[in-house]
UniProtKB/Swiss-Prot annotation:
NCBIfam families: CitB, PRK15033.1. [4Fe-4S] cluster 2 binds at C38, C62, C65, C68. This is Citrate utilization protein B. Disulfide bonds: none annotated. One of its GO terms (biological process) is citrate metabolic process. Keywords: 4Fe-4S, Citrate utilization, Iron, Iron-sulfur, Metal-binding. The keyword Membrane does not apply. GO terms for molecular function: 4 iron, 4 sulfur cluster binding; metal ion binding. [4Fe-4S] cluster 1 binds at C28, C31, C34, C72. InterPro entries: Citrate_utilization_prot_B, NarG-like_sf. The keyword RNA-binding does not apply.
Amino acid sequence: MKQLEKLIIEATVLTEPEAEVERVMQVCNACRYCEGFCAVFPAMTQRLEFGKADIHYLANLCHNCGACLHACQYAPPHEFAINVPKAMAQARLETYQQYAQPAAFGALYRRAGITVALALIVGLTLFLLLAMALKGSLIHPPLAGDFYQIFPHSLLAWMFGSVFVLAIGLLMAGVIRFWREISPGVPRSAEIAEASHNALTLKYLDGGHGKGCNEADDAFTLLRRRFHHFTFYGFMLCFAATVVATGYHYVAGWEAPYPFFSLPVMLGTLGGIGLLIGPAGLLWLNLRRSPLHGDARQKPMDRGFILLLFLTSLTGLALLAGRDTSGMGILLALHLGVVMALFLTLPYGKFAHGFFRCAALLKWAVEKRRGKHAGDTGN
């Protein structure tokens, strides 16, 4: 009786996207044709009903590869209209909104295009005006690449350090709450290792057969996986460049500017190239993708994030090329403005999907070893 009451309560509080995932999963659980495609379907088979936590877990476990859509006999125009990628994408947006910190800022996910545009305007205006205030002009005699003659190191470290730490802290607070609600128990080292491998290799963007995802049609391609790798590892190389440069400054006492063949500059250059190739490729695929894949309402969020990553790299490489010229001030202001816009939107844009997906992958690694109820206090 208590189980029935629980199901009734859950049914009454499901949002429309959550209810659609529940409907789709009930049909898929009866069919199971797609069981070998990715982690979603084996995880689905461990359940007879789908509560809110299950729905959000499965939605974030889905990588939107599209294989199940093109293999499904019940996909549109069938009257069942089973479209797993679309249902999961719509539920993921609910995840981001419901677990946003502070909660009121969850609405920014639905207005991500406007949010990115405003953040970009604020960031660019801030640093262009700041450069004018500190130097009196955006054009100056060549400064031999010394950025700190325009913006003091302490000012940049304080501004960007505080914004980045706050953004990651807010994002992690939501992910931790998500993790606790899907109740997977405490992960072991082998489970963490497997989830990390699956995340870093993007295992579930191979379509379940190694040939890749579906994009514009039912043809398989590994391009989305490749462009994601360029983007992620390009970002991580740029982050590594910042970490190394910070170590040079605070530990070794070596102040910028660093020569081109120094470790920070080489890491940043390679990362920047990756952040040009990856986002450009992802945007190209996004523009070509079948309208049946994913949620069309999220395209502004997807494209806004892609654009910010691309502009971060483009302005950074332009700054490197022009750092010994009289235009370094304006190039630096443009680059810092774009980076600030990226940092400001990290907790309320597409960046969040990587964190929630990693949590779902870790849950799956725990679940397939120990069962669905591993760590659940009520079971």
